[in-house]
Each structure stands twice: as structure tokens, then as C-alpha cells.
Amino acid sequence: MTNIRKTHPLMKILNSTFIDLPTPSNISSWWNFGSLLGLCLIMQILTGLFLAMHYTPDTSTAFSSVAHICRDVNYGWIIRYLHANGASMFFICLYTHIGRSLYYGSHTSQETWNIGVLLLLMIMATAFVGYVLPWGQMSFWGATVITNLLSAIPYIGNTLVEWIWGGFSVDKATLTRFFTFHFILPFIITALVAVHLLFLHETGSNNPTGIPSNMDMIPFHPYYTIKDMLGAFLLILILLAMTLLTPDLLGDPDNYTPANPLSTPAHIKPEWYFLFAYAILRSIPNKLGGVLALLLSILILLLIPMLQTSKQRSMMFRPFSQLLFWTLIADFLTLTWIGGQPVEHPYIIVGQLASILYFLLILVLMPMASLIENKLLKW
């Protein structure tokens, strides 16, 4: 008798995705982050669902409803902080996942890569509208500043901003629609994740060497299910430690002050995971130029498959490219730090240099290094 998991229409899909999937035998722990992202998404949807049961998307009660969740709802405080810190863990896994794909040349699977970039944009949008919901000072002013950037678009800018706001300022209509978007987007993301996996399994996983591994595959279960479980336990351990010991480490103290349109916080800044893009935005003195640079800092990822000049897929055996890759990581961290600093000397010039280096590395230096490596290997 054939096994039900190989014959049942639904089980067959799950089987070919998580059980009998042929997987390269040499993939390292850097490949754990895909499953960790899936875990983060599930945790965010579940904690978010319970928060939505008690939250009220209304300007007069939003802030107090979050306080009510933390004070009066059974274990509301842990659900709220798991959700807030879960978002941080989500972005740590996300950036690591993208970094790993860049290093090992996974971007050559173009459909998987492009859907991944679309997923990144949607997760960023979800996180942005979610940050507005507690209706603290930073929520309100973050929403005002970031949505206002659209007014830089010629002709239709101002109309577009008022259309998104649902009025002449960030108010009740804005909060309601942001809550709606924050609720619906994770489900669209889940559907896109399925498409992302579908395209990934068309070509199969890459491996650290970048060499096709068709002759050396092992089943996903039990080898990688157990490996993913270890990663999952570590992720949950770090998340719980953060949530229970330092729940506000990555938050902004200004968000514990109710939103007040009449007083502007001294430093308006987004959550830490947007600071690199915010630093790039601020480094250009022109509004439209800044907005374009902000968009390009993310959309540049779509160009990366076209900028692949190396004859080798992975950076494992390419020392020049490795050096530039780690320079890019250091530059990303520098931008993140600069985004959280006030606009004054020397932070302005450091931010501008880091922004120039970011685009220079991706568009010019890394493709050139790959060509030099090809020449050295007489390819």
C-alpha cells in the first residue's frame, strides 16, 4: 500500500515541500533563516490576532486600548511585547536571509529573488503601518513625516498625501485605514511566501559552493527538520529573553507619550530596521532626490541579478568580492547607526559618505571585482 502522504492531494504538496524535498547535503546554518522567517510570520499573525481582539483603531481610544491590553488583559503584556519584539526578530532574520542570498549567489534564481524583494517591500509596509497603531508621539509623527514624503511627487503629490490621510492631516481616518492594511497585509504576505517557495522548489536550493548539487541530495526530513528546529529554539530563546528582560530595548521612549499634533518630538526617527533607508533619505538635501534614493536603496535589489558579472555563482572562492561584501555589511550597519543620530556635524557627512558608498559598492565596485576575479582565473 502506498503511503498516504504520497497519494493524498493535499498531503502530496506538503510532502514534496517539507518531507521528501531533495536538499543539498552541504547547506550551512545560514540556510536556516528561511524557516525562521516562516516561524516569525506565524508568531506575528497569532500574537497580532489576539491584540486585534482588544485594540480599538480610534484616535481617542487607541493609546489607552494598548495600555488596557498591557494592564488588564490576561497575559496581554507578553502578547504585546512578543509582537513588538517579534517584528525586530523578523527583520534580523530578513536582512540575514538577504545577505546570505547575496553572498552565495542565490539571486541567480530570478523569480524567487524578485518575489523575495516584493515580500521585503510588503513586510516593510506592514511594519510601518503597524508602528502607527499604538498612537504614541513617534507613531503619529513617523506617520506624518513618512507619508508626507509622497508630496515630493510632481503634480499629484499633495493630492496623493491627502488621499492616503483621508483628510488634511494624519487623523482618525488614517489610523482606521492603517489598521485595516496592517490586518490584511500579513495574509497577502503568507500567499506570496507560498509562491516564493513554489519558485524555489522549481530550481531547488542553492548551496555554499554555488555548484549544482543534483548528484548529492538528501531528503529534507529528518536531516533539515531537526536542524531547523534547533534554529527555531534559539530564535524563541532570544525572543523570550528580549521580551521578558528588556522589552523596550529596541522601542522609542517617545511612544509612551500619547500622540499630540501640537508638540513635535526632538528627534523623529523610525524603528531601528528602517534607519539605514532613513539615513539615505536624510543624506540628500533635496526632498525629491531623497525620496528617490530611499526607494532605490530597496529597489536596487532587483538589479542585482543583472549586475552578476562573475562566472562563479558563490562568493565562497572569491576573496575580492568577499571583502566588498563585508564592506557593504559594515556600511549598512553604519547607515543604521547614522539614521538614529541627530542631523548635525559630523553625522551629516558620515551619512552622505556611507550613502554614496552603499550605491557605489552595489552598482560599480562589486561587479568590477567579479570581472577582475574572472580575469585572474583566465576565464
From Swiss-Prot:
Any one GO BP annotation for this protein: mitochondrial electron transport, ubiquinol to cytochrome c
SUPFAM superfamilies linked: a domain/subunit of cytochrome bc1 complex (Ubiquinol-cytochrome c reductase) (SSF81648), Transmembrane di-heme cytochromes (SSF81342)
Membrane topology classification: Multi-pass membrane protein
Residues binding a ubiquinone, per UniProt: 201
Positions with a binding annotation for heme b b562: 83, 182
Cofactor: heme b
Disulfide bond sites: none
A GO molecular function held by the record: ubiquinol-cytochrome-c reductase activity
Domain of life: Eukaryota
Amino-acid positions noted as binding heme b b566 in the UniProt annotation, renumbered to this chain: 97, 196
Keyword Ion transport (UniProt): no
Cofactor: how bound: Binds 2 heme b groups non-covalently.
Keywords: Electron transport, Heme, Iron, Membrane, Metal-binding, Mitochondrion, Mitochondrion inner membrane, Respiratory chain, Transmembrane, Transmembrane helix, Transport, Ubiquinone
Residue ranges of the TM segments: 33-53, 77-98, 113-133, 178-198, 226-246, 288-308, 320-340, 347-367
UniProt cross-references to PROSITE patterns, sorted A to Z: CYTB_CTER, CYTB_NTER
Record Pfam families: Cytochrom_B_C, Cytochrome_B
A GO-annotated cellular component: respiratory chain complex III
Tagged with keyword Phosphoprotein: no
InterPro entries from the UniProt entry: Cyt_b/b6_C, Cyt_b/b6_C_sf, Cyt_b/b6_N, Cytb/b6-like_sf, Cytochrome_b, Cytochrome_b_C_euk/bac, Cytochrome_b_N_euk/bac, Di-haem_cyt_TM
Compartments in which it is found: Mitochondrion inner membrane
Function, in words: Component of the ubiquinol-cytochrome c reductase complex (complex III or cytochrome b-c1 complex) that is part of the mitochondrial respiratory chain. The b-c1 complex mediates electron transfer from ubiquinol to cytochrome c. Contributes to the generation of a proton gradient across the mitochondrial membrane that is then used for ATP synthesis.
Other notes: Heme 1 (or BL or b562) is low-potential and absorbs at about 562 nm, and heme 2 (or BH or b566) is high-potential and absorbs at about 566 nm.
Description of how the protein assembles with itself and partners: The cytochrome bc1 complex contains 11 subunits: 3 respiratory subunits (MT-CYB, CYC1 and UQCRFS1), 2 core proteins (UQCRC1 and UQCRC2) and 6 low-molecular weight proteins (UQCRH/QCR6, UQCRB/QCR7, UQCRQ/QCR8, UQCR10/QCR9, UQCR11/QCR10 and a cleavage product of UQCRFS1). This cytochrome bc1 complex then forms a dimer.
Protein name as catalogued: Cytochrome b
Organism: Monodon monoceros (Narwhal)
